[in-house]
Curated annotation (Swiss-Prot):
Required for neuronal survival during early development. This is Protein LZIC. InterPro entries: ICAT_dom, ICAT_sf, LZIC. Gene3D superfamilies: Beta-catenin-interacting ICAT (1.10.10.490). Residues 6-64 form a coiled coil. The gene is lzic. GO terms for molecular function: beta-catenin binding. It comes from the Eukaryota. Keywords: Coiled coil, Developmental protein, Differentiation, Neurogenesis.
């Protein structure tokens, strides 16, 4: 009986991760194709995707309140969704790696970005934004940042990222996290 519960939990987690991956990929594809879309079509598609993320977040909240064995596994996904909804992170790839708790891949992405900015393949503005997102994600995953990274983060963190960081610092306060997600959804719909 217990093994069946583990199997079902594993399958549910896999389905949830696949759903999150699909939504994050949809956001990433949308950003990559932005130039090919009319502004209205882009905004409508983004709004629909954020609504789907919000619905997915609501489902996660219900699952977390009803099944305590899933709390740890789903908590990371929920934080990633809230980051996307609040638009604290603008890079879907960073959100995906954060949700899957993959600090090694985040650090690899950071190294690739350092190289890309040096050879002129990546603009300084995009580099700064994505580096701040990655460093914030690493900090949220409990990774130790260098003094240099901490200084970079302090100098470049946006108000949205700072707000996300402050609210999620008290993970015990699910109401605050949900308030952040709700305010992010409200801002994107207006």
């Amino acid at each position: 009986m217990a093994s069946r519960g583990k199997s079902e939990t594993s399958k549910l987690r896999q389905n949830m991760e696949e759903q999150l991956d699909r939504l994050m990929q949809q956001l990433q594809d949308l950003e990559e194709c932005r130039e090919d879309l009319e502004e209205e079509e882009y905004e409508e598609t983004k709004k629909e995707t954020l609504e789907q993320l919000s619905e997915f977040n609501d489902s996660l909240k219900k699952l977390m309140s009803g099944n305590m064995t899933l709390v740890d596994e789903l908590g990371g996904m929920q934080l990633a969704i809230q980051a996307a909804i609040s638009q604290a992170f603008k890079t879907p790839e960073v959100i995906r790696l954060f949700a899957k708790k993959q600090p090694g891949q985040l650090r690899t992405r950071l190294a690739e970005m350092d190289r890309d900015v040096m050879v002129g393949k990546l603009s300084r503005d995009v580099f700064t934004q994505q580096k701040v997102e990655i460093l914030t994600a690493l900090r949220k995953l409990g990774e130790k940042l260098t003094t240099e990274d901490e200084a970079f983060l302090a100098a470049n963190a946006s108000a949205t990222l700072s707000h996300f960081e402050k609210v999620t610092a008290s993970l015990g306060s699910e109401d605050k996290i949900m308030a952040l997600a709700s305010s992010g959804v409200g801002k994107t719909q207006t």
